C-alpha cells in the first residue's frame, strides 16, 4: 500500500467550541494534495451518549455505525465514533468483493477482498491531521470468519453456508460524530471524499460540507423522545443454538484432549446463536 506524502502541511488544529475547520482557503490548498478532507465542527455535548447521538443523526441510514471500545476495568475508552451516513461500501461474499454505491475512481470496483481494499486505500491514502480525532475518514466495518482464507489460503472454508450475511462489509463513511469523553466535546465531521480525483468543484464541495455540518448541528440540538425499555411483562426472546448441547460438549472434550496431548496450547470452541428480532 502506498502512502502519500504531500508537500502541503497544514498546521496542527485546535478548535474552540462552535468553531469549524478548515476555512475555505485551507480547504482549497488541501484539495490540491489529498482526496480526503474532513470538515470539522466542535460542539459541547457532554450529556450525550454514543447511542443517543446515533439516534439523532443516523436514523438507520445506509452505512451507519457505532465504533467504541471498553478499557480494562469496564470503563469506556476516550473516544466513541458514530457514523451517520456512508457513500458506498465494499461487500465480500464467497471470495469475491465489490463496491456498492459510490467508489473511488481509479480503484478496483471488484476483485478479491484484499485487492479491492488495498486499491481503495492506495487511491485515498492521506496523512493524519494533527489535533483532529483519531478517525476522520475511513473504511469501517466488520470481518467474518469466511474472510480468513484471504489471509491464510490453507484454511479453506469447508462449513456449509447457512446465512446470507456477507463475509465482510466495509463502509466509506461520509458523516461522522466523534465523542471525546475526556472533554465532553463532539466533533461533527462532514468528510469530503474526492471520489473522481478531479480538481473541479472544490468550492462546491466545501459549501456542501458546511451545509451537512449545519444539518448535523441542528439534528443534534433537536429534542428526541427517550427510549426507555422495561422487562415487565415482556416475553424473553427464544435463543436458537446452532449446535446441540451434546455435540458442543463433545467438541470441548476433544479440544481438552488435544491440549493435554500437546497438539495445541489454546482452542476456543464457539457456536452461532440466533435470535429473531423486528429491529432494523
Please give the residue ranges for each predicted region.
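Extended alpha-helical targeting/anchoring segments
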Residues: 2-280
Amino acid at each position: 500500500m502506498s502512502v502519500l506524502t504531500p508537500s502541503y502541511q497544514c498546521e496542527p488544529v485546535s478548535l474552540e467550541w462552535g468553531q469549524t475547520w478548515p476555512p475555505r482557503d485551507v480547504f482549497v490548498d488541501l484539495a490540491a494534495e489529498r482526496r480526503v478532507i474532513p470538515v470539522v465542527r466542535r460542539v459541547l455535548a457532554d450529556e450525550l451518549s454514543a447511542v443517543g447521538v446515533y439516534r439523532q443523526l443516523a436514523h438507520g441510514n445506509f452505512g451507519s455505525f457505532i465504533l467504541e471500545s471498553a478499557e480494562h476495568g469496564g470503563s469506556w475508552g476516550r473516544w466513541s465514533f458514530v457514523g451517520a451516513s456512508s457513500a458506498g461500501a465494499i461487500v465480500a461474499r464467497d471470495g469475491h468483493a465489490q463496491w456498492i454505491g459510490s467508489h473511488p475512481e481509479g480503484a478496483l470496483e471488484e476483485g478479491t477482498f484484499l485487492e479491492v481494499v488495498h486499491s481503495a486505500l492506495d487511491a485515498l491514502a492521506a496523512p493524519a491531521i494533527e489535533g483532529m480525532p483519531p478517525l476522520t475518514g475511513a473504511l469501517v466495518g466488520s470481518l467474518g470468519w469466511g474472510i480468513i482464507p484471504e489471509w491464510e489460503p490453507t484454511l479453506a472454508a469447508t462449513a456449509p453456508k447457512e446465512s446470507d450475511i456477507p463475509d465482510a462489509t466495509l463502509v466509506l463513511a461520509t458523516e461522522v460524530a466523534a465523542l471525546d469523553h475526556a472533554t465532553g466535546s463532539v466533533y461533527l465531521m462532514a468528510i469530503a471524499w474526492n471520489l473522481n480525483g478531479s480538481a473541479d468543484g472544490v468550492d462546491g464541495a466545501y459549501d456542501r460540507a458546511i451545509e451537512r455540518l449545519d444539518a448535523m448541528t441542528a439534528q443534534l440540538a433537536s429534542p428526541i423522545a427517550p427510549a426507555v425499555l422495561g422487562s415487565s411483562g415482556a416475553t424473553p426472546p427464544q435463543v436458537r443454538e446452532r449446535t446441540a448441547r451434546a455435540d458442543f460438549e463433545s467438541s470441548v472434550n476433544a479440544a481438552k484432549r488435544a491440549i493435554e496431548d500437546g497438539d495445541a496450547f489454546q482452542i476456543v470452541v464457539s457456536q452461532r446463536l440466533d435470535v429473531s428480532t423486528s429491529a432494523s
